């Protein structure tokens, strides 16, 4: 009997917050608030499983194009999330990491990101990663520049060492909520052999129960990694 696949790194594109709110006659920001609650539910579910890394697409390099009022709200929401969740992370042995080009964020937000990163550094359970001002193409360019500056040979192995996610294994399973069928410039290098799952469920409505069903399907799939 074939062994079930091992899921160590789960990545999620959390899509559908705005549409969730609009369908209910609410402002888009209300969808982001509800989406933050879903982050908490999914993170706690993963922390109680064998998953080692959960990487969430929280804010892309393209999201700056949204209305300033929405971007400002997202920054405040992120700040509130980092402060409110700190105790939860530590209590549940969850390590926090952030990836992306963080230089565009305010010094206050950077301090909050660094504070939670340092406080949770010794946690040995799930590592929750927020992709912030993240774009995969941008990440690969930055990694290549670092390789050149370090004077090392440009190779697949070396590039992986200089990516934002150098601390984590490649993605095993990638889920996108919201009904669209695209990767949106997310973890393109790391997801080369990831199993992809797309669901019409909007992120605020996504549950640990639905994720559990997808994980069972993942475990049954045959991962060939280019072989037969």
Swiss-Prot record:
An MF annotation (GO) of this entry: magnesium ion binding
Enzyme Commission no: 2.5.1.-
Cellular component annotations (GO), alphabetically ordered: cytosol
Gene Ontology annotations of biological process type: polyprenol biosynthetic process
Residues at the active site: 15, 63 (proton acceptor)
A Pfam family the protein falls into: Prenyltransf
Cofactor(s) listed in the protein's UniProt record: Mg(2+)
CDD domains (UniProt xref): Cis_IPPS
Source superkingdom: Bacteria
Residues that hold Mg(2+) according to the record: 15, 195
Annotated substrate binding sites: 16-20, 28, 32, 60-62, 64, 66, 176, 182-184
Cofactor: record remark: Binds 2 magnesium ions per subunit.
Key words of the record: Magnesium, Metal-binding, Transferase
Subunit-structure text: Homodimer.
PANTHER family assigned to the protein according to its UniProt record, in alphabetical order: DEHYDRODOLICHYL DIPHOSPHATE SYNTHASE 2 (PTHR10291:SF0), DEHYDRODOLICHYL DIPHOSPHATE SYNTHASE FAMILY MEMBER (PTHR10291)
Family membership noted in the UniProt record: Belongs to the UPP synthase family.
Described function: Catalyzes the condensation of isopentenyl diphosphate (IPP) with allylic pyrophosphates generating different type of terpenoids.
Descriptive protein name: Isoprenyl transferase
Organism (species): Wolinella succinogenes (strain ATCC 29543 / DSM 1740 / CCUG 13145 / JCM 31913 / LMG 7466 / NCTC 11488 / FDC 602W) (Vibrio succinogenes)
Classification lineage: Bacteria, Pseudomonadati, Campylobacterota, Epsilonproteobacteria, Campylobacterales
Gene coding for it: uppS
